Structures are given as structure tokens and as C-alpha cells.
């Protein structure tokens, strides 16, 4: 009986503090992170490519995309001045480039989803949804964005040397720093 109770306790703790690490052996010693990436390789997070922002049905604030029409990285947020949600452009210019010919013949499953954490009601749409209210994602960390040899359109990293968010539109990097 003691073994069953102990096993049950560990299962509940594992479900409650679910964390995912990609590219590293274990997650950081913090309960405030739901998803983090290894920081030893010059690799980034590739955002989903969409034909245009209007093709994203049911977007919620926090949704991030690479818009093939505008060739820009965008995220969906609440704009107080407009009292509504808007797509915010994270790319400096629209000179991006992306070759989507390989994807054009593929069949898409618009309801495909992976979620980390406790699922919300109503269901939140997205390819990868971080469900927890009190946890965050740690972007892939790189010493310098320029160490990524062949970045893909829609790639995001955090440059630890310059302490900035870097997004790639297919041609140029854009930088966000506080």
C-alpha cells in the first residue's frame, strides 16, 4: 500500500510540474518554465508558416507566425489604443524570402495540436500550445545570432551576448532589446 501511495504521489507531481526540454538532458531547476531548449547549438525555434495572418482561424493573444504573404514574423496581441487584438510585426522590413514549394503539395491537418500543461476550456488553437498560466518558454539561447549558418524564415533565438530577441524573415534579422 505504501508503494502505491508513493507511486501515486510521484505521478501527480510529474503531471502538475510538467516541463519539456529539447536539446538538453534535463530541465532547469525551476518550476516557472514549461518548455526550454538546449543552449549549446546554434539552432533556433522555427515558427509555423501561414499563407497570411487572416488564414489563422481563432488566433489568441500570444500566437506567433511567419506570414508568407508579407514575409514577416508576427505575433497576435491586445492593442489598448484600438481596444482589440491585432497582429504585431516583429520584422524590421518586408524584404524577407521563403521558398514554400516543398510544402505546397503536402496535406495540412489544421486541427493538429500539441499542448504542454493543463489543457484549457475552451480549447486554445495552435500547433504548439503552452497551457499553463504560471510558466513560460525559454527560447533557444545562442552566443551570437550570426553563429546560425543557414537560418530559416521565421526563426527565433535569444542572443545571450547582446541580450536581445532575434527574428529572421528569410533575408534579414530583426532585433528586439529592452
Where are these regions (language model features)?
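Bacterial Sec-dependent N-terminal signal peptides
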Residues: 1-23
Amino acid at each position: 500500500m505504501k508503494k502505491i501511495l508513493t507511486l501515486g504521489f510521484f505521478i501527480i507531481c510529474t503531471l502538475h510540474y510538467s516541463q519539456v526540454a529539447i536539446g538538453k538532458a534535463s530541465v532547469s531547476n525551476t518550476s516557472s518554465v514549461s518548455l526550454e531548449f538546449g543552449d549549446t547549438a546554434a539552432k533556433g525555434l522555427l515558427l509555423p508558416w501561414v499563407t497570411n495572418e487572416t488564414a489563422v482561424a481563432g488566433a489568441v493573444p500570444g500566437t506567433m507566425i511567419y506570414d508568407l504573404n508579407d514575409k514577416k514574423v508576427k505575433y497576435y496581441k491586445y492593442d489598448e489604443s484600438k481596444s482589440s487584438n491585432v497582429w504585431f510585426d516583429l520584422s524590421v522590413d518586408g524584404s524577407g524570402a521563403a521558398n514554400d514549394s516543398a510544402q505546397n503539395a503536402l496535406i495540412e491537418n489544421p486541427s493538429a495540436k500539441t499542448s504542454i500543461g493543463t489543457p484549457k476550456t475552451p480549447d486554445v488553437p495552435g500547433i504548439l500550445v503552452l497551457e499553463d498560466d504560471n510558466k513560460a518558454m525559454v527560447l533557444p539561447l545562442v552566443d551570437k545570432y550570426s553563429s546560425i549558418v543557414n537560418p530559416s524564415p521565421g526563426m527565433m533565438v535569444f542572443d545571450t551576448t547582446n541580450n536581445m530577441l532575434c527574428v529572421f524573415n528569410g533575408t534579414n534579422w530583426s532585433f528586439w532589446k529592452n
